Amino acid sequence: VGEPTSVALVQTNIMQTLKWDPRWLQRWLNENLEWTTQTADAALTVFPEVALPLWVEDLPQGYLEALEAPAKAQGHDVLIGALVQNTELVATHKRAIHNAAISLGAHPGQQYAKNHLVPFGEFSPPFFAWFYRFANIPMSNQTPGGNKQAPLVLGGQKVAVNICYEDAFGAELIHAVPESTVMLNLSNLAWFGNSAAQPQHLQIAQARALEAGRPMLRATNTGMTAYINPQGEVLAQLP
């Protein structure tokens, strides 16, 4: 048994119809700043999937520094979901787009990039790539992060991160379990509205916690944000 730690799981509760509306952008950015101020006493503050509603590279100058400042001042960490554009230094010189979780605060510069992408939403199957190029659908050409990503060191823990429905594929997550002390899922189920998707996804996370023998933390946009113990029991939950 290791040392206890404290984690703040932020549920942003942003409607999907407003999330990408530029008229609301400044409000969402300001609310994130307010959350990090309120949760600075926690060793780790976790935001949900794509909590930053624009590319990291397009954020206002100094925004990430302001976002991490309250936690960093106390030697604490922040993990936030974001869309990241990386230029791969390979012969093709293609841009790599990742649905990622990036670390800020005391241990910045760490990243987990989603590996199991959703076909037709996050990547184009080979025989349909022509259609996506024609339709110019945004964010449909994402790059997998790789299936051997190491746990992130955050809040005094080794955190095995997964994003959205990656936790439905236990065989793809199990490689990180021996090195980790906790599992962490970042999700945005606002796409599914008020449906069975939220309780179903929580049950999937419970199965992964029990299977791995590790606590599972869930930070979601509209629910269900939760702490699940290694026995698969939900000990704390937001609606």
Language-model features: locations:
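Enzyme catalytic cores with a strong preference for nitrogen-chemistry domains
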Residues: 1-239
